Amino acid sequence: MRLVLLGPPGAGKGTQAQRLVARHGIVQLSTGDMLRAAVAAGTPVGLKAKAVMDAGGLVSDEIVIGIIAERLDSPDAKNGFILDGFPRTVAQAEALDQLLASKGLKLDAVIELVVDQEKLVNRILNRAAEAQAKGEAVRKDDDPVVFKTRLEAYNRDTAVVAPYYKARGQLKQIDGMAPIDQVTAAIDGVLAEAA
């Protein structure tokens, strides 16, 4: 099972990815985690990434795809994976398609968690208020200013990825505003259809 989960920050992608990993024995591939691991391991692609990051630059799509290619060859990724934080642009989606094709693979599903962004902002504000009321630290991502900045970046840069997959007939949309268990059940339904 090879999946991409799409949706804005706060839509519940991380929660659903954790549930999919636990139920299906697949791995969650976070580009940020993979980048750090490749740098730490000193792989050829990791060394390229380190040079760029040390110079204060953004890691290119080519390097990120190289890191994903290395990671897909790992034994634990053979049963499948969920991509988290990738692709973020149409160019990355196209590069991912080419990478998978070169390995004789394809995505089984691209699932978008569709949310009402105004209600989503309220959800995040409530989550932050609940954490404060319990005396817990508020997640940096839940700071209203930070969250709105992330949402604007998503709308500007990443929202175009869903139409890319829709045009290819790969996109399945799920109501991300539903209760968590209902979202999980809807994802399971999509995966059953794809199997």
UniProtKB/Swiss-Prot annotation:
Stated family: Belongs to the adenylate kinase family.
Subunit description: Monomer.
Residues covered by region (LID): 126-143
CDD domains per record: ADK
Catalysed reactions listed for this entry: AMP + ATP = 2 ADP
Recorded domain comment: Consists of three domains, a large central CORE domain and two small peripheral domains, NMPbind and LID, which undergo movements during catalysis. The LID domain closes over the site of phosphoryl transfer upon ATP binding. Assembling and dissambling the active center during each catalytic cycle provides an effective means to prevent ATP hydrolysis.
Protein's UniProt name: Adenylate kinase
Protein's cellular compartments: Cytoplasm
Region (NMP): 30-59
Binding site for ATP: G10, A11, G12, K13, G14, T15, R127, A178
UniProt-annotated binding residues for AMP: T31, R36, G57, L58, V59, G85, F86, P87, R88, Q92, R150
EC number, UniProt record: 2.7.4.3
GO biological process entries: AMP salvage
CC annotations in GO: cytoplasm
One MF annotation (Gene Ontology) recorded for this entry: ATP binding
SUPFAM superfamilies on file: P-loop containing nucleoside triphosphate hydrolases
Species annotation: Xanthobacter autotrophicus (strain ATCC BAA-1158 / Py2)
InterPro entries per UniProt: Adenyl_kin_sub (IPR006259), Adenylat/UMP-CMP_kin (IPR000850), Adenylat_kinase_CS (IPR033690), P-loop_NTPase (IPR027417)
Pathway: Purine metabolism; AMP biosynthesis via salvage pathway; AMP from ADP: step 1/1
Function: Catalyzes the reversible transfer of the terminal phosphate group between ATP and AMP. Plays an important role in cellular energy homeostasis and in adenine nucleotide metabolism.
Record's keyword terms, sorted: ATP-binding, Cytoplasm, Kinase, Nucleotide biosynthesis, Nucleotide-binding, Transferase
Source superkingdom: Bacteria
Short name of one Pfam family: ADK
